[in-house]
Every structure is written in C-alpha cells, then in structure tokens.
Amino acid sequence: MSTKEIVKNVNIKNKKASFEYEFLEKYEAGIVLKGTEIKAIRMSKASISEAYCLFDNEELWIKNMNISSYDKGSFYNHDPLSARKLLLRKAELKKLFMHSKEKGLTIIALRLFTNERGYAKIEIALAKGKKLYDKRESIKSKDNEREMQRIRI
C-alpha cells in the first residue's frame, strides 16, 4: 500500500462485551493475518462478538473471530474461523497469563480496528463476568442517563 493512499478507518466493536463483562485491564494487540484476511477486514467484513482469547505455548491466540471470505480471493482465500496469533510485549503476555489462570477471569475481544498506518489491531481486555443483578444495575443506570438527557433537552 502506498503512503499516498487513503486508508478507511475500520472500527468493529463487540457490543455485548460491556453488558456481560466488567473490564479490569485493556490492551492493544497486533494480529498475524494472511493477505485476504486484511483485505476483508478493511471492507468491515469481520465479527468479534463470539471471540475469546487463550494461551497455547506461552502465545496468545484468538479463537472464533469471524473474518468473512474476501470476494476476489479465489482459491487463495482463508478459513473464516481459524485461530489467529496476537502480538503483545513479553511483560504484557506474562501478566495476562498469570491473571487468566485465576478463577472467573477471561480475555475477550472488545474492538477490531485499523490504525493510521493501515495495520489491523485488536483491543482485548482481561474481564470478569457480571452477575445478573449487575446487568440489571447497568440497565437501570443507562435508563436514568437517557431520562436525564431528555430532561436537559
């Protein structure tokens, strides 16, 4: 890609994540992709709503991230649900590895985006699942905020 070419900013969010989880720490990670995968991401043909991360041989992998097939890829296309390696610093990987072993904590994908250089990045978070009453509480607070906005206008 030339430097003069304008890159469309991609911003794919996991909307269910903030409702179902409480985020403890957030990280920005690079993704190891094949050629047709990055082209499909730039066309916003990806979904991270079912994605989760796990460790394999001290490497962080994301599973269940759906990157649809690229239309013009012919037989060079990729597998839409294959596992993809995430790139983080060693200190961050060690910290995540230690915390992910704790009971009740998981690593989930929050947002898939492209940076100003055109590289695909993913925002992940160390998260703890919310209880049912926590979910009800967050719904009530959102309703109250909407009511306050209506009153102000």
UniProtKB/Swiss-Prot annotation:
Which region is the signal sequence?
none
Q: What does this protein do?
A: Required for rescue of stalled ribosomes mediated by trans-translation. Binds to transfer-messenger RNA (tmRNA), required for stable association of tmRNA with ribosomes. tmRNA and SmpB together mimic tRNA shape, replacing the anticodon stem-loop with SmpB. tmRNA is encoded by the ssrA gene; the 2 termini fold to resemble tRNA(Ala) and it encodes a 'tag peptide', a short internal open reading frame. During trans-translation Ala-aminoacylated tmRNA acts like a tRNA, entering the A-site of stalled ribosomes, displacing the stalled mRNA.
Compartments it resides in: Cytoplasm
Top-level taxon in the UniProt lineage: Bacteria
Q: Does the keyword Cytoplasm apply?
A: yes
Please give the chief subcellular localization of this protein. Answer: cytoplasm
Question: Which species expresses this protein natively?
Answer: Cytophaga hutchinsonii (strain ATCC 33406 / DSM 1761 / CIP 103989 / NBRC 15051 / NCIMB 9469 / D465)
* This protein's name: SsrA-binding protein
InterPro entries assigned to the protein according to its UniProt record, in alphabetical order: SmpB, SsrA-bd_prot, SsrA-bd_prot_CS
Q: Does the keyword Transferase apply?
A: no
- What PANTHER family does the annotation carry? SSRA-BINDING PROTEIN, TMRNA-BINDING COMPONENT OF TRANS-TRANSLATION TAGGING COMPLEX
Look up the coiled coil feature and give its residue ranges.
none
**The organism's taxonomic lineage, starting at the top:** Bacteria, Pseudomonadati, Bacteroidota, Cytophagia, Cytophagales
